[in-house]
Amino acid sequence: MSVKQIAFGSKVGESLLNGVIKLANCVQVTLGPNGRNVLIEQSFGDPRVTKDGVTVAKHVELEDRYENLAAQLVKSVASKTADMVGDGTTTATVLARSIYSEAFKGTSAGMNSMELRAGIDHAVEIVVEKLKELSIPVKGDYQKISQVATVSANGDTEIGDMIAQAMEKVGSDGVITVEEAKSFKTELDVVPGMQFDRGYISPYFITRQDKGIAELERSYILLYDGKISSAQSLLPVLEKCAKESASLLIIAEDVEGEALRMLVVNKLRGVLKVAAVKSPGFGDRRKAMLGDIAVLTNGYVVSSEVGMRLEDVRIEDLGRADTIVIEKDNTTVIVNGPARSSVKERCDKIRSEIQEATSDYDKEKLQERLAKLSGGVAVIRVGGATEVELKERKDRVEDAMHATKAAVEEGIIPGGGTAFLRCVKPLEEVIKSAKVQERGRDFICGIDAVRKALSSPCYQIASNAGKEGGVVVAEVLKASDVNVGYDARHDQYVDMIKSGIIDPTKVARTALQNAGSVAGLLNTTEVIIAQVPEKEKPNMGGGMGGGMGGGMDF
């Protein structure tokens, strides 16, 4: 077992706070319409330029091991916020820094950290309820949807309009994906495709570590209605795909044992681009959904019920897809070109089954299948003059897309940190209440930490615009209209809703809840146990070189 470094007492809090501050200082410059770029050195390829908070956070590694632990913890919260709603990572980081900074002052003054944490949790609950009161529904209002997307894309109206058009074409519950274009132009296209709620069986199938996804281009698809555990049964189809230098997606009830090990080894060694996901649905519905995917991709379901064996699968039996994106919990299959007549026939068959269905549950599941098969996939192809510009623009499109979906779910609130400022007064009233006063100063200090932190997003947006943050916050707080806030782009105070400066309620709520959670955890941490860095062993030289690995691993 490796030796550990251990820290106790005041050193713990100071190190953790320094780590959080350093991370927040890197991320906060990207906040708002006047957010600045961050230039990131990469281990290979060109440097990366981005305004995406979670991308910046992912690249922060601090030299001090104790400080780095705090930074990693806040990074995980930023990533969790991104995973849940796709945006709000910078806001979550800034709020976490502010809440923890205020709470740390109380702990340093001898207050009970557990009571402080209880106060933080109580304040977060109150603010969440207030945000829900301020929220305005937007489902079906494509002008508001465009405004949400524009704000999240750092004010790029072209991106905002394109996402609104995509949502209008495939519906608010439809599938929208983002790809890199082969030209300078950014274009929208609706193509046949489907998304289902199953992700990769093993994280070793991931091809893009920065996004945590597996991407396959021009891929074959093997559809099997049982479990696959034998490596031998898969060998023939794998060899056929490798011979054609094609990638392969396996969709089966499960892939396990030696079959899974063989797939992972060959993927890691670069022998074959392959991934495996579990079949969507259960029982008869699983078979039906496999049939839907087969029709969409022009393949066949390999089934023992009709006498088919994996060993006998021909390349013609496999489905084909132009793009496959596999996330932790979802898989999207895209087939470019017009929908085939077989897809339309399958949709007609499902419609007739809906009419014949007697139970509401069966009708609902059939409606889901019909929507997945007939809705198609909206593909936004992002263009750029250089690879650096393309990646930066693609980051913004993905952020905007996720923020838009969040807005449809829970509505919108005044943007620019305005909604958080409208929650300051309710917290002040709570602090004055007899019930809270009875809990004592430690509990009140926790509530006050959140109250003070609520001004930090607006303060930072103003600072990034070259203004005095404290003055801007005071002006917004003075306004009697709850929708009035600071328009950093035009340097004026406006009705944020009417001006289209809006944030999804879900993004703000999630950012605050995650920030409050991590601040409470950090403030109740008394001991740090960290790895002692290993000393580099001297290079003795003169050793024999290793032999070349060879051959296929099938």
Curated annotation (Swiss-Prot):
Gene Ontology MF: a single term: unfolded protein binding
Protein location: Cytoplasm
Keywords in alphabetical order: ATP-binding, Chaperone, Cytoplasm, Isomerase, Nucleotide-binding
Cellular component aspect of the GO annotation: cytoplasm
Swiss-Prot/TrEMBL catalytic activity: ATP + H2O + a folded polypeptide = ADP + phosphate + an unfolded polypeptide
One BP term from GO: protein refolding
UniProt keyword Cell inner membrane, yes or no: no
SUPFAM superfamilies linked: GroEL apical domain-like, GroEL equatorial domain-like, GroEL-intermediate domain like
Keyword field contains NADP: no
Enzyme Commission code(s) on record: 5.6.1.7
Chief subcellular location: cytoplasm
Residues reported to bind ATP: T30, L31, G32, P33, K51, D87, G88, T89, T90, T91, G416, D503
Family: Belongs to the chaperonin (HSP60) family.
Function statement: Together with its co-chaperonin GroES, plays an essential role in assisting protein folding. The GroEL-GroES system forms a nano-cage that allows encapsulation of the non-native substrate proteins and provides a physical environment optimized to promote and accelerate protein folding.
Subunit field text: Forms a cylinder of 14 subunits composed of two heptameric rings stacked back-to-back. Interacts with the co-chaperonin GroES.
NCBIfam families the record matches: GroEL, PRK00013.1, PRK12849.1, PRK12850.1, PRK12851.1
PANTHER family, alphabetized: 60 KDA HEAT SHOCK PROTEIN, MITOCHONDRIAL
Protein's name according to its UniProt entry: Chaperonin GroEL
The organism of origin for this protein: Holospora obtusa
Gene name in the database record: groEL
